[in-house]
């Protein structure tokens, strides 16, 4: 695990109950404030509030962010593997990676991905929901295809596109993390992290992969600085914060940027 890296703050802009112009303005302001990573989510309907309220699609939005932004890394937290074929996902990610390069050395896209869970998306858009196990099996298979396709595309990605995987299930999810993830979004408490590290390391031995560069991520929702400090002490280095409009609370962002800066001082 990579513990000697700066703390970064990621903000997940929730693409619901706002107009796209509001999202565009939030992206601009968050980058200007110094946020490190911007995320959206990959759903087709709001997750809370009015279930039929305004909502926007993830990947189209990410391509717009690639062109709009100059510095931040960005991606979905997380992509739903079920909604697009693996090879198409790879090509979309590679294309957005190139769009975001904009004169820099590399692109800034993070390929955050997961197996999917929101059944309404599946039912209304015509995807087979299957079971949690079948969706995880598909994710494992499709990630192999994504990586293989990245090796075939012309032009190739501008860098090894970082793969971010969330979850904590020890039999399937953490094996996928050990095989593919550059960033693990952990969803666990500080006390649980050492055990989960051990599970990932055992799977890494099975997969023959060195995880010394794995970055650990966690969320700040309903947590204070005391919990964030404990997560930091346990090895977390990317902290994510949900952000919803239309009444964006930028004071919350300022608070956590101050905390981040104190850790990096």
Task: Outline where the language-model segments fall.
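Active-site-adjacent structural elements that line small-molecule/cofactor binding pockets in enzymes
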Residues: 1-265
């Amino acid at each position: 695990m990579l513990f000697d890296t700066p703390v970064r703050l990621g903000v997940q802009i929730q693409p619901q109950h706002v107009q796209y112009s509001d999202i565009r303005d939030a992206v601009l302001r968050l980058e200007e404030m110094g946020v490190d990573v911007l995320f959206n989510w990959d759903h087709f309907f709001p997750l809370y509030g009015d279930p039929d309220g305004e909502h926007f699609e993830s990947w189209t939005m990410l391509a717009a962010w690639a062109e709009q932004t100059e510095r931040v890394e960005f991606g979905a937290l997380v992509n739903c593997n079920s909604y697009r074929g693996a090879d198409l996902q790879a090509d979309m990610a590679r294309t957005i990676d190139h769009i975001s390069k904009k004169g820099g050395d590399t692109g800034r896209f993070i390929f955050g991905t997961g197996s999917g869970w929101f059944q309404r998306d599946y039912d209304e858009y015509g995807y087979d929901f299957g079971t949690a196990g079948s969706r995880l099996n598909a994710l494992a298979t499709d990630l192999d295809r994504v990586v293989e396709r990245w090796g075939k595309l012309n032009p190739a990605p501008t860098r090894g596109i970082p793969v971010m995987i969330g979850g904590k299930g020890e039999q399937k999810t953490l094996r996928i993390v050990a095989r593919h993830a550059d960033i693990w979004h952990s969803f666990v408490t500080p006390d649980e992290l050492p055990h989960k590290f051990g599970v990932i390391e055992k799977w890494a031995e099975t997969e023959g992969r060195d995880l010394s560069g794995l970055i650990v991520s966690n969320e700040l929702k309903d947590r204070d600085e005391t919990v964030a400090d404990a997560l930091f002490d346990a090895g977390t280095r990317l902290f994510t914060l949900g952000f919803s409009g239309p009444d964006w609370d930028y004071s919350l962002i300022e608070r956590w940027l101050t905390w981040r800066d104190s850790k990096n001082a």
